[in-house]
């Protein structure tokens, strides 16, 4: 039952991002709710789905799918500092990919944005890959796999 709840939460969280951001639904919702209303609805739904996802993961049974080699834990520990640097760099001012940003007023990309346009997505991609490599259970595959699918730049 707990694995089913985790799977449904992962589908709603990941699918909700794709559905609400789709070019055919988003404009309709923005027209009906306004930009701020849409962002409020989107944020509230994703926050609820994410909380459910984490709650379900914490309660999921451990079902081993494979036994990760010890080196995978070292790989995860090696990738996490890079993921953290990318995440912190993405929170810098003048982020062309942040909600409400006006890219035309940002000028030449600087800092981490001179390296990649989406440092936060790369941070989550590395984070998910590192955790998938270091964990071999069904709940981890569902959680980290769904976040990887969402984060792939």
Residue ranges and their predicted role:
Residues 1-117, 122-153:
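Membrane-anchoring alpha-helices and their flanking helix-loop junctions
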